[in-house]
């Protein structure tokens, strides 16, 4: 790994471990690498993320490149999105204009629609999992397929996964649900946040109270503040997305025909739809599924921490202490 890639900086951290920006010494290409500690952290979610992600080739989805092993970690190498998270853009701007929100929403729906066409539902769509490529006219890049499920490979989802603010009512029931329909709800939350600058089902006075958020999700209690100017077409679309009964919720194909969605639709999206999503620019995955599965199995064996990169160990130690603080905060919320 170290012979092939030169580490440049940390990009972020989460429950999984650390993500770093690295340079491919051969091609000079910048790529992102997600490091997951070998051993018990290499579970079904990690395997699912890698296998599902490998099969996806679409301009609005972060490209999977390969998996490697280090003495201590499983490393997932993927396309680098230089523009960062869409979430950060909203934090900076406060909220987007309706036209800006539509521009990003159109790309999000294009990427999600492609996943669904391959029978893959994401199950954790949110602004933090929506990156930008850094170009002057930013291209959305969906990432993080750790909770994704493939109808071809896995059973119907019934576990409660995802981020509280984005979870659909049926996901909270702990019964089987259609992951594609739940993804539509999460796309609606993303659209609302872009337009309003806050979450639709959080109590503004008590945003960290997850119980209150869940109660409002189940009751579909949301409103658009008076100070936010949103067209009637857009309001109608949101009201068709935020429907508690999943069988009555608008579907992705219906969203793609909606008047509001079709306005100023970028030519590349409409042309891609006609071409049935074939991303001709994308090279096919170089690693065979069999090789990936072999690497994953090997990664389930704990690594030799004595051989670890000291900088990576320091980042992981810092992450652990942050996680402990966050867990304490969440405990206080209940």
Curated annotation (Swiss-Prot):
PTM per Swiss-Prot/TrEMBL: Autophosphorylated in presence of Ca(2+).
Coiled-coil region(s): none
Matching SUPFAM superfamilies: Protein kinase-like (PK-like) (SSF56112)
Cleaved signal peptide residues: none
Catalytic activity: L-seryl-[protein] + ATP = O-phospho-L-seryl-[protein] + ADP + H(+); L-threonyl-[protein] + ATP = O-phospho-L-threonyl-[protein] + ADP + H(+)
Domain Protein kinase: 5-261
Organs and tissues of expression: Expressed in leaf blades, leaf sheaths and roots of plants grown hydroponically. Expressed in shoots and roots of young seedlings. Expressed in leaves and maturing seeds, but not in roots and stems of field-grown plants.
Keywords: Abscisic acid signaling pathway, ATP-binding, Cytoplasm, Kinase, Nucleotide-binding, Nucleus, Phosphoprotein, Serine/threonine-protein kinase, Transferase
Record-annotated active site: 124
GO molecular function annotation: ATP binding; protein serine kinase activity; protein serine/threonine kinase activity
Induction record: By abscisic acid (ABA) in leaf blades and leaf sheaths. Induced during incompatible interaction with the bacterial pathogen Xanthomonas oryzae pv. oryzicola.
GO BP terms, alphabetized: abscisic acid-activated signaling pathway
Binding residue positions for ATP: 11-19, 34
Activity regulation information from UniProt: Activated by phosphorylation. Activated by hyperosmotic stress.
PROSITE patterns for this protein: PROTEIN_KINASE_ATP, PROTEIN_KINASE_DOM, PROTEIN_KINASE_ST
Source domain of life: Eukaryota
GO cellular component, one term: nucleus
Enzyme Commission number(s) of this protein: 2.7.11.1
Main location: cytoplasm
A family per Pfam: Pkinase
Functional summary from the UniProt entry: May play a role in signal transduction of hyperosmotic response.
Xref: PANTHER family: PROTEIN KINASE DOMAIN-CONTAINING PROTEIN (PTHR24343:SF558), SERINE/THREONINE KINASE (PTHR24343)
Protein name in the entry: Serine/threonine-protein kinase SAPK3
Species: Oryza sativa subsp. japonica
